[in-house]
A protein has these predicted regions:
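C-terminal and late-domain segments of enzyme folds
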Residues: 2-43, 48-64, 68-71, 151-230
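General beta-strand structural signal in soluble alpha/beta enzymes
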Residues: 19, 79-80, 102-103, 137-140, ...
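A conditional alpha-helix N-cap/helix-loop micro-motif detector
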Residues: 30, 83-84, 119-120
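A short acidic, amphipathic alpha-helical/loop segment
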Residues: 32, 36, 89-90, 126
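A general structural motif
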Residues: 42-46, 97-98, 134
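Portal/gating segments that form or line small-molecule/metal binding sites
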Residues: 53-116
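Class I SAM-dependent methyltransferase SAM-binding "motif I" and its flanking Rossmann-like core
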Residues: 103-179
């Protein structure tokens, strides 16, 4: 069930919070945003699934950057093995102690393949199971794109396909007012996500967090998302 973009709109059937981030993850500019999300998670155990990265050193590097970043914030970090290499290990790492799942950026098409592709779909199913049980998910760039109902795959010719539909609409990472990297349908709801900024969607409301001016487009009109307050 997706989440509608409305100011402090009451939401139902949404167990774990989501954070849609615009990119430049694990950099100093993202510290306060990620600290906020971690504090809202059910536990300080963060599991990193870098499925948007290429197999091998790219995946390992993304996990290492996430580990360093979140350990500085006080989290216990679980480095989830690449499901394309060790599916059983990845599933075992996503246990019930996890309070936050982190999806770094990279290839949105590649991440979607990892989460719903026949060979590794069990990881996506486990992610959704944990989310329904109250586990938060924070996705940056490709990670945010995949969580939405629709996503653009710039690495697959720029086509628009179905995402996980944990949030309504389509995410535009690396966004700033007045810019557009991709063509999008006029009637589609859009999330404008600046680098080191984003939106938190929880059981009660939708709020902006981090840098820039995270915004939402509904009925063709852009409006800023109200700021998160403690």
């Amino acid at each position: 069930m997706g989440r509608l973009a409305a100011t402090h709109e009451e939401l139902t059937d949404v167990p774990g919070l989501l954070c849609l981030q615009g990119g430049r993850e694990f950099t100093p500019g993202c510290v306060e945003m990620d600290r906020t999300v971690l504090a809202l998670a059910s536990t300080a155990v963060a599991a990193v699934v870098a499925g948007a990265a290429r197999i091998g050193s790219d995946y390992d590097g993304a996990v290492l950057r996430a580990r360093r970043h979140y350990e500085q914030l006080g989290a216990t970090v679980v480095a989830v093995p690449d499901p394309r290499v060790d599916l059983d290990g990845a599933l075992a790492a996503l246990d019930d102690e996890v309070g936050l799942i982190v999806l770094p950026g990279g290839s949105p098409g590649g991440l979607l393949d990892v989460l719903i592709g026949a060979a590794t779909a069990a990881v996506g199913e486990r992610l959704l199971e944990l989310h329904r049980a109250g586990v938060a998910i924070s996705g940056a760039s490709a990670g945010a794109m995949v969580m939405c109902a629709r996503l653009i795959r710039p690495d697959r010719g720029g086509d628009t396909v179905a995402g996980l539909a944990l949030a309504d609409g389509l995410a535009l990472p690396h966004w700033s007012p007045g810019t557009s990297r991709w063509r999008t349908p006029d009637d589609l709801m859009l999330w404008g996500l600046p680098e080191c900024g984003g939106v938190i969607l929880d059981a009660d409301h939708i709020s902006a967090v981090g840098r820039g001016e995270p915004s939402v487009r509904r009925d063709g009109v852009w409006s800023p998302v109200p700021r998160h307050t403690e």
